[in-house]
Amino acid sequence: VRGAVCPYVSRGGLKLEKALRDFGVKPEGFVCSDSGASTGGFTDCMLQNGARQVYAVDVGHGQLAWKLRNDERVVCMEKTNFRYMLREHIQDDLDFASVDVSFISLKLILPVARELLSDSGEAVCLIKPQFEAGKENVGKNGVVRDKNVHISVVEMIVDFCLNNGFDVLGLDYSPIKGPQGNIEYLIHIKKSN
């Protein structure tokens, strides 16, 4: 018996697919970024939803799927930490940014995203409690099981967004758990003026 075939180069695309659908984001014609691109599931999802261009940014190298590397709409930015991205690294303001990073807090990524977004730019980010909660709140194998820690992490990121130039438009569960079964959250934000 076979399950459904994933329509993206990785299951990560299913996370962004849910966010685009549930938050009503339509990236058709958009210039986008995919921070933490890895294999490119988010990049693939954006392209399949009409993105004009995607900057696929990742600190690693050799991970982005071959079909995306060869797509003229994709700018592969390997060995690049989004945290240190500057305006001159991209040709146009971003209409949309996705963030799916590990081992770093969103609090270090979001100020950079805000600088690169257009005045009406939006973003969908994965909130990963295991990278936001602090070591004392992360259990065995890097799993956060305490519901109260999840709540405090989500509240912290929402507050950070609101206090750092973003409006929060939506919040939901990710349809796929992270490694080791971590529950992750999707947040939809928009640059406030």
Predicted regions: what they are:
Residues V1-V25:
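S4-like RNA-binding module at protein N-termini
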Residues P129-D146:
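Short, glycine-/aromatic-enriched active-site segment of Class I SAM-dependent methyltransferases
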Residues H150-N164:
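Short alpha-helix
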Residues T39-G50:
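Conserved SAM-binding loop of SAM-dependent methyltransferases across substrates and taxa
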Residues E28-S38:
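Conserved class I S-adenosyl-L-methionine
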Residues K107-V124:
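A short glycine-rich, Lys/Arg-flanked "PGG" loop and its adjoining helix->strand segment in the class I
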Residues I176-N193:
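Core SAM-dependent methyltransferase catalytic element
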Residues Q53-L108:
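S-adenosyl-L-methionine
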